[in-house]
């Protein structure tokens, strides 16, 4: 393979994906916002800020210039936080040629517009560029992927040929990629699982046990599915890696930033203090508000999401939120 690849965003996930591709001997340029981080990675071959202890492949190069990262590339992997993605895409737009395959690896819903990342891309980029959009998602902690622990994810695109190209690009003996054409479902699954992970963390922080966590995961999946279906997603997507798979991992794994936020809230910390301790973005904090507003706009019932929003943004006590969920009107189980 002789593809030239740019990766936009040098957090833990962006660095991991860039390193995965560079380990295959591909020509990969990783863009970081912080100039000092670029210099450190060049000098030490380690991203000590976001992925400490992982040696970066010799084939991986680093830049603080979006022009250098994006110009002339065959694939551009987008790993900027979802709330700044629009601004990054606006800067990239004049640099991108038709035919470049865009791979979104960020998980969130834009707060101001309630758009998913594919919708943001379509709004900002010329149609001849945006048509090659894809999304890479699934249960994949960056550190485990970096350590080459077996991982399976999904590459989704409305164009099956684009999805297949992304599948071929990223697949390694330890990183298995499936294809899908349900971009909406994969994006909603990736975004909403972070909100439910905050809820699971709150439950763990309160010491409520495994029964509670299992209920939150199951009913959280129902909320994700209902919202996705209202937006045109396919129901089977939510039973797959980008739905149930990512949800289970993020709600149970100790490496989950969103679960960690919830756990500390459940233990009594204030949100500002929790976020002040974190170097990396917990997408579920902003996505909780986006999803809550999207549910109200679409008329989709999402009680767990509503309570997470209230705990995060209206200072509702965590234990009160749990009790309000448990004392809702009785009803039949439904999706």
From Swiss-Prot:
Pfam families: NAD_Gly3P_dh_C (PF07479), NAD_Gly3P_dh_N (PF01210). GO terms for biological process: carbohydrate metabolic process; glycerol-3-phosphate biosynthetic process; glycerol-3-phosphate catabolic process; glycerol-3-phosphate metabolic process; glycerophospholipid metabolic process; phospholipid biosynthetic process. The active site is at 193 (proton acceptor). It is found in: Cytoplasm. NADPH binds at residues 12-13, 107, 142, 257, 281, 283. InterPro entries: 6-PGluconate_DH-like_C_sf, 6PGD_dom2, G3P_DH_NAD-dep, G3P_DH_NAD-dep_C, G3P_DH_NAD-dep_N, NAD(P)-bd_dom_sf. Transmembrane segments: none annotated. GO terms for cellular component: cytosol. It catalyses: sn-glycerol 3-phosphate + NAD(+) = dihydroxyacetone phosphate + NADH + H(+); sn-glycerol 3-phosphate + NADP(+) = dihydroxyacetone phosphate + NADPH + H(+). Its EC number is 1.1.1.94. Keywords: Cytoplasm, Lipid biosynthesis, Lipid metabolism, NAD, NADP, Nucleotide-binding, Oxidoreductase, Phospholipid biosynthesis, Phospholipid metabolism. Sn-glycerol 3-phosphate binds at residues 107, 138, 140, 193, 246, 256-258. It is an enzyme of class 1 (oxidoreductase). Signal peptide: none annotated. HAMAP family: NAD_Glyc3P_dehydrog. Catalyzes the reduction of the glycolytic intermediate dihydroxyacetone phosphate (DHAP) to sn-glycerol 3-phosphate (G3P), the key precursor for phospholipid synthesis. This is Glycerol-3-phosphate dehydrogenase [NAD(P)+]. It comes from Geobacter sulfurreducens (strain ATCC 51573 / DSM 12127 / PCA).
